[in-house]
Curated annotation (Swiss-Prot):
Gene this chain is encoded by: pyrD
Keywords, comma-separated and alphabetical: Cytoplasm, Flavoprotein, FMN, Metal-binding, NAD, Oxidoreductase, Pyrimidine biosynthesis
Functional note: Catalyzes the conversion of dihydroorotate to orotate with NAD(+) as electron acceptor. Together with PyrK, also forms a metal reductase complex able to reduce Fe(III)-chelates to Fe(II)-chelates, as well as soluble Cr(VI) and U(VI), using NADH as electron donor. To a lesser extent, can also use NADPH as an electron donor. Is unable to reduce riboflavin and FMN with NADH as electron donor. May have an in vivo role in metal reduction in D.reducens, which is an organism capable of reducing contaminant heavy metals and radionuclides.
Subunit annotation: Heterotetramer of 2 PyrK and 2 PyrD type B subunits. However, the metal reductase complex seems to be composed of a heterooctamer of 4 PyrK and 4 PyrD subunits.
Family named by the database record: Belongs to the dihydroorotate dehydrogenase family. Type 1 subfamily.
Enzyme Commission identifier(s): 1.3.1.14
Name of the protein in its database record: Dihydroorotate dehydrogenase B (NAD(+)), catalytic subunit
Organism: Desulforamulus reducens (strain ATCC BAA-1160 / DSM 100696 / MI-1) (Desulfotomaculum reducens)
Lineage: Bacteria, Bacillati, Bacillota, Clostridia, Eubacteriales
One Pfam family from the record: DHO_dh
Localisation: Cytoplasm
């Protein structure tokens, strides 16, 4: 049986539905000894800001039951460094390179999108709207449908690249925000970003993370992420990249059945650098065993 694993996220053609979560795969180079990057549907690289950022105080990572808390604080060398040092590598790849962007203001997102729009080797932008809005007292852009839509619109007006907006789960109604972002022109959605959490050292009687709170990822968040994908799929008509605790092909297939067109592998990369490759192989095996020729037949099939 000939299998079709190819999917589309807006104008983005992917040879299969598997990509990587920003911040867990570096800039691709770090994992190239383990995985043929060109065999992935896409790679999403580490988050980029307009100016270099040092990130949050240490410790920045702590293991929790079935997950990891991280508080990296968007440490990166800034967009100029990305364009000079990483884009030449991106140009050599056949796979789609998606750059994750963050800003302190809507204007910063727009400036960043415009800079990246000029570069070859970048296939799409993923917009992290979980950042604090410095003009609105630090509330996350993604916490309110109006500011989420505003950032989306500014980015869309600043680039011809496909725009994928990464939604925060730390909200009351994720479907409302998804609809607002779709209305503002988003080409796709990444669902979900990390859940806000913390850990406390009982000996020191202090939070473990240097920044007190951090983002929870890994298997612990999977039921929440699946629920979010299910709700968003029913609310919008644009494609979804599902993520949150995907460790194997079975996890990935659950997200696709819930409505995700593609899936993003994050924490699993830390545990097993071959995770993405093994998930693709597991998907192929499932399709063969079940007599399904096209992965797209499974998208949202659990809703039927």
């Amino acid at each position: 049986m000939k299998l079709n694993l190819a999917v589309k996220i807006g104008q983005l053609d992917m040879i299969n539905p598997v990509t990587t979560a920003s911040g867990t795969f570096g800039y691709g180079q770090e994992y190239s000894p383990y995985v043929d990057l060109n065999q992935l549907g896409a790679i999403v690289v580490k988050g980029t800001t307009l100016e270099p950022r040092e990130g949050n105080p240490t410790p920045r990572l702590v293991e929790t039951p079935s997950g990891i808390l991280n508080s990296i604080g968007l440490q990166n060398s800034g967009v100029d460094y990305l364009l000079e040092h990483y884009v030449p590598f991106f140009k050599k790849l056949q796979t789609n390179v998606i750059v994750n962007i963050s800003g302190n203001t809507a204007e910063e997102y727009g400036q960043l999108a415009a800079r990246l729009d000029e570069a070859d080797g970048i296939a799409a932008l993923e917009v992290n709207i979980s950042c604090p809005n410095v003009k609105k007292g630090g509330m996350a852009f993604g916490g309110d449908f109006r500011t989420a839509a505003e950032v989306t619109k500014v980015v869309k007006n600043s680039t011809a690249l496909p725009v994928i907006v990464k939604l925060s789960p730390n909200v009351t109604d994720i479907a409302e925000i998804a609809r607002a972002v779709e209305g503002a022109g988003a080409d796709g959605l990444s669902v979900i970003n990390t859940l806000l959490g913390m850990a406390i050292d009982v000996r020191k009687r202090k939070p473990v993370l240097g920044n007190t709170m951090g983002g929870l990822s890994g298997p612990a968040v999977k039921p929440v992420a699946l629920r979010a994908v299910w709700q968003v799929y029913k609310a919008v008509h644009i494609p979804i990249i599902g993520m949150g605790g995907i460790m194997n092909a079975t996890d990935a297939l659950e997200f696709i059945l819930a409505g995700a067109q593609a899936v993003s592998v994050g924490t699993a990369n830390f545990v097993n650098p071959y995770a993405t490759k093994e998930i693709i192989q597991g998907m192929e095996k499932y399709l063969m065993e079940n007599g399904i020729g096209d992965i797209n037949e499974l998208v949202g099939a659990a809703h039927l």
